[in-house]
Amino acid sequence: MKRLIHTAVLAAALAFALLLCGCSGAETSHKAPQRAAVESGERQFAQPSDGDFIAIFSTSLGEVRAVLYPDAAPMAVQNFVGLARSGYYDNTVIWRAQYGFAVQGGDAGGTGSGGATIWSNNPYPLEADSSLRHYAGALCAAFAQGGEVMGGNSQFYFVTALPNSVDETMQQQLRDNGYSDEQVSAYAAAGGLPYLDNTDTVFGQVYAGMDVVDQIACVPTVKNE
């Protein structure tokens, strides 16, 4: 079973449809989590300032807004915005919607195995910045496809990890690996996917409409055979 969610997105009026293809073998449904506001000094939890680059995703379930970070991930932002302005994302699909993990799209082929870049489709390198983490709501460039680590391209995802996903054991592991107390506290409050921090690139963060992202992740889906 597949459900189309028609969407208009971003900074130059990018429009595309989200076709949700689940990751489980049977149809499943979930209830969107309740997310409290996170009080943190981490930049990803600050409201955008004048002059910040904002991505606006207008979907049939509501609007999502994300601030982009060209200072920390210049190539990821340049590629995303360039492709959006060119119309590349028009009528592409969200091929992965996994509750408590992520919703992912950006492959014009709709399979998750392809992608494009503004550099004649040549991939760009990983941009891992210690000031940006895979907190819930992070907008990320996907580098791992089919179990292989690839260069960056058009594929992106929103982290939908649950608020309680980073438990005390994982918090201690983060401290042991040099994460600051502020970052550990942010992960504990927001939830996230810290094991992806040096694997994929974070280039934005949802600051409005995370409830919409969660609704997309909760749409009943079945495995796309």
Residue ranges and their predicted role:
Residues 14, 22-225:
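Cyclophilin-like peptidyl-prolyl cis-trans isomerases
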Residues 3-25:
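Sec-dependent N-terminal signal peptides of Gram-positive bacterial secreted proteins and lipoproteins
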